[in-house]
Amino acid sequence: MKLGIFGLLLFTFFFQSQAVHFYFDGSKPKCFLKDMPKGMMVTGIVKAEQWNNEANKWVTSNNIKIRVQVDETFANNHLIYKNDLRSNEAVRFTTTNEGTHRICYLSTSDGAWFSSTKTRLHVDLASDDKYNLIASSEDEAKDLTDRVAALNTRLESILGEQMLQRSREMTFRDTSESANSRVVRWTIVQIVVLLVTCIWQLSHLQRFFVKEKLV
């Protein structure tokens, strides 16, 4: 978590064209993520220093190389820049697509990875044009606005579907109640007709029995 916050702060400094520095511990790379628009040219200088125990200070060494690598994380880590630089050499690359880019720094020396040498790297990066930074911020803000608008549209659609579902449920309930009411009325009518029929038949049988003197 601390490394992520550190990386975010570093990139904030980078794209305000302020020099920062960080340390390499052995052969572990330092990587940072940054959202950048398409066509942004990033330029800068890297300065690598090595700890000198005899002098008890950091000194610049031509034996130190810094490998700078830039990948597009949104395109299966597509590599757009890779270069081995010596101290005070320039970094220069242009983004080919909009999205999150990962910039990694690795310390090397004489073709081998550092195993225990302490290295301090100074980095000063900036975009080629302030307009790009403004455009990037505007694009991010527009993207966020579009997402909010899309969410609002989706929410309205969901609410509309819920209202339609409620209307259908009310219609179904009314239809069901009406059908049940008709069934009950028809059942009552059938019972009444059946009772009347039974009474008439009993009365008819009684008269028949009396007439035939069976009772």
UniProtKB/Swiss-Prot annotation:
Residues 29-125 form the GOLD domain. This is Uncharacterized membrane protein C16E9.09c. SMART domains: EMP24_GP25L. Residues 207-215 are cytoplasmic. InterPro entries: Emp24-like, GOLD_dom. Residues 1-19 form the signal peptide. The chain crosses the membrane at residues 186-206. Keywords: Endoplasmic reticulum, Golgi apparatus, Membrane, Signal, Transmembrane, Transmembrane helix. It comes from the Eukaryota. It is a single-pass type I membrane protein. Residues 21-185 are lumenal. It is found in: Golgi apparatus membrane; Endoplasmic reticulum membrane. GO terms for cellular component: COPII-coated ER to Golgi transport vesicle; endoplasmic reticulum; endoplasmic reticulum membrane; endoplasmic reticulum-Golgi intermediate compartment; Golgi apparatus; Golgi membrane. Disulfide bonds: none annotated. Belongs to the EMP24/GP25L family. Pfam families: EMP24_GP25L. The keyword Ribonucleoprotein does not apply.
